[in-house]
C-alpha cells in the first residue's frame, strides 16, 4: 500500500441501494459481494484517517430506482457516510462532471485515487478514464466493483468493426 504516502482519496461511486434490487434493469449481476468488500475497504480507510469521498448518482428520470425520491437512491448500509466525509451527487456517468470533484481534489492536494463502486462498465470505467486524463494516479481494488450483463447490442463491437482509415 505504497500509495498511502501519496495523500490518496478513496472514491466510493454509486454504492446505492438500487443495485441490491433483483429487478434492477441491467441484466444478471456479477460480484454480489462488491458492497461488502467496499465496506471493508472503507473501514480500513477510516482507521487510517485517510480522505473519503462518497459519490452518488441522482437520476433525472422520476421513474428510475436511482431518482432521489426513491429508496434506491440511499447509500448502501455497508458504506453509509459518517462525520465529515464528503458527499457529491452526480447526474451523469462520471464522478468528475458537474460535481466539482477535480477542484476539490486539487484543493486538498490529492493526486492519487482508489476507486470502488458501481458499475464497472459505466460510472467506474468513465470515472477512472477521466481521472487518468486529469493526471491522477488511479487504483482499482480487485472485487470492489460489479456490473451487469449487456442486454442488446454491444456497441463496443461497432468500434472494433469500423473500417480503418489511413491518411496518404
Enumerate the language-model features and the residues they cover:
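Active-site acidic carboxylates
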Residues: 1-86, 103
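Glycine-centered short loops/turns at secondary-structure junctions
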Residues: 49-50, 109, 135
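Short, hinge-like loop/turn segments at secondary-structure boundaries
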Residues: 69-73, 132-133, 155-158
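Internal catalytic-core helix/loop-beta-alpha segment
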Residues: 84-121, 125
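A short glycine-rich beta-strand->turn/loop micro-motif centered on a GG-aromatic cluster
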Residues: 114-117, 137-151
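Short Gly/Thr/Asp-enriched flexible loops that form oxyanion-binding sites at enzyme active sites
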Residues: 124-134
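Single conserved hydrophobic/aromatic residue that forms the stacking wall/gate
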Residues: 158-168
